[in-house]
């Protein structure tokens, strides 16, 4: 659908856009192999199997928080960790980024709800 394609392209632009005080992009952590934060391996969304494994396991129960969380919440928290401006819940930007990630995870089987640290 043309609107979905437009959303994907905006999400892709956002995924690679660098900004904030650390000049990070989503791709800084999720666009290459071998990235980790503390003990957590980070998925490379440029590889379908990585994207599928990551995207299809949300919503998830976050043990550290004792709560179910959505992919959109995960993006909000990632933006916070990057010191980026707050990504508004249900904003067009958040929907575009989720659309991009969902397309990258195409053909993955849902494996939710999952349990995350």
What label would you give each PLM region?
Residues 1-12:
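Short, charged low-complexity linear segments at domain edges
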């Amino acid at each position: 659908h043309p609107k979905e394609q437009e959303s994907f392209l905006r999400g892709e632009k956002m995924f690679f856009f660098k900004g904030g005080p650390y000049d990070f992009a989503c791709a800084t952590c999720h666009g290459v192999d071998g990235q980790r934060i503390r003990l957590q391996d980070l998925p490379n969304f440029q590889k379908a199997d990585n994207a599928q494994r990551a995207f299809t396991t949300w919503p998830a129960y976050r043990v550290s928080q004792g709560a179910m969380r959505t992919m959109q919440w995960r993006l909000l928290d990632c933006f916070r960790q990057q010191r980026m401006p707050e990504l508004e819940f249900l904003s067009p930007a958040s929907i575009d980024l989720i659309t991009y990630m969902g397309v990258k995870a195409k053909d993955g089987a849902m494996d939710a709800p999952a349990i995350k640290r």
